[in-house]
Regions:
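Radical SAM enzyme [4Fe-4S]-AdoMet core and its adjacent flexible, acidic
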Residues: 1-7, 54, 100, 120-122, ...
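Conserved alpha-helical substructure of the radical SAM core
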Residues: 2-126
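Flexible loop residues that form catalytic
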Residues: 46, 79, 132, 200, ...
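Residues at alpha-helix caps and immediate loop-helix transition turns in enzyme cores, especially N-
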Residues: 58, 86-87, 115, 179-183, ...
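Generic alpha-helical structural signal
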Residues: 60, 88, 150-153, 181, ...
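Short Fe-S-cluster ligation motifs
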Residues: 65-78, 365-382
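Residues embedded in well-ordered beta-strands within globular domains across many folds
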Residues: 75, 128, 196, 236-239, ...
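Accessory C-terminal segments flanking Radical SAM cores
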Residues: 241-376
């Protein structure tokens, strides 16, 4: 199979996107329907489609709204987006308008080689497949369906054979934190370009008791940093902006004198580049990221389910740029507690979704972070 041709212009450089105007990434939950019953599902997915979902005509108009924002990267997700028969029309319309499109299907009977090929021909640039364990015992327990692990491997193999760039997603919880090294080996073996590591936020079916501790977050961040130095794939994190702080700290340790090289925040993490100073530009809920639900509600992210509007009533660009919720989330001066006092608040800012899920206030301290800002004298989190 030949590599996929370049259909659209290259993604913009991370620093060239004004997050006050355009998100770097927009995720769109086109349906909540899914055949799986994942224990940590953000969407609390259901077996049948919701009759309130955006119609095919509304869906195409939403694509036009997204294009008018400045062409962020579009992630088509669910539930299982393959449960929508018009998903290929949505992808084709988005790709034809110049958007880079990622698809996040569930590894079910719908993820046939034929359907994956249809997505590729419609214009998908990347495929995201979840793997939450290195073996059936761990993964299938997560997914709630026996045989899901084997099906996941089959889908990944089909994606690779079709020449579609593969991103593997893993949700970190107390059930699989010890399995991460083995999962990383699987990620390499399937030829993934990116490993996206999500740190559980208590929303949907995800429970606070399933989360790893703050110290386990920190230890995992340092392990991921070490892994990223040698892995054949890029490492990215979701709902873990404090990983950026760890990367900066570890980079400073490795380059104590600077040597004329500064850290640069990019979509894939931190890279090095001569003569370019860092900016306070870190993607977070509502800051460089936007989420549209299956019924058109506009959220800062799928894990911070506080609606700022609906695409049926307002253009998504208007809500993202001007709503009180989104503008507050992009203002680090409004952060509270340790996050508000932290010298890394611009590039990190803590997970606003986790702060909301654990404290009820999306501007409060992210309780999963152990770091004590220089200006704060209290001890680290437990």
């Amino acid at each position: 199979m030949q590599p996929m041709p370049d259909r659209v212009p290259p993604r913009p450089h991370y620093f060239d996107v004004d997050f006050n105007v355009t998100p770097f990434t927009l995720a769109w939950e086109v349906t909540r329907a899914c055949a799986l019953a994942c224990v940590h599902c953000r969407a609390t997915a259901q077996p049948k489609r919701d009759p309130r979902e955006l119609s095919p005509e509304e869906a195409l108009r939403v694509v036009d709204q997204i294009v008018e924002m400045g062409k962020p990267i579009l992630i088509v997700t669910g539930g299982d987006p393959l449960m929508r028969r018009d998903v290929f029309d949505i992808i084709r319309h988005a790709s034809g308008k110049g958007l880079r499109v990622g698809l996040s299907p569930s590894a079910t009977a719908l993820a046939t080689t034929q359907n994956l090929a249809r997505a590729r021909e419609a214009g998908v640039d990347m495929m995201h497949i979840s793997m939450d364990g290195s073996c059936p015992e761990v993964h299938d327990a997560f997914r709630g369906v026996k045989g899901s692990f084997q099906r996941t491997l089959e889908v990944m193999n089909s994606v690779r054979e079709l020449g579609i760039p593969l991103q593997v997603g893993t949700t970190v919880s107390r059930y699989n934190i010890g399995d991460l090294p083995a999962i990383a080996e699987r990620v390499a073996s399937v030829g993934a370009r990116v490993w996206s590591v999500f740190f559980l936020v208590p929303t949907g079916r995800g429970q606070m008791s399933d989360m790893v501790s703050p110290r386990e977050h920190e230890a995992t961040f340092n392990w991921l940093y070490d892994l990223s130095r040698t892995a054949s794939f890029a490492v990215r994190t979701t709902a873990a902006p404090h990983y950026r702080r760890v990367v900066i700290q570890r980079t400073r340790q490795a380059q104590p004198s600077g040597g004329g090289v500064e850290w640069e925040l990019t979509g894939a993490g931190y890279a090095f580049r001569e003569g370019r100073a860092p900016r306070d530009q870190g993607v977070n809920d509502g800051k460089g990221f936007c989420f549209i639900s299956h019924v058109g509600d506009i959220y800062p992210s799928g894990f911070l389910q506080v609606s700022a509007g609906n695409v049926r009533e307002q253009p998504v660009a208007e809500v993202y740029r001007h709503s009180a919720l989104f503008t507050a989330l992009r203002n680090p001066a409004l952060l509270k507690g340790r996050c508000g006092a932290c010298e890394f608040r611009g590039v990190c800012g803590g997970s606003r979704a986790r702060a909301y899920g654990l404290t009820g206030d999306y501007m409060e301290t992210d309780p999963s972070c152990v770091y004590v800002p220089a200006s704060v004298q209290s001890g680290p989190a437990a």
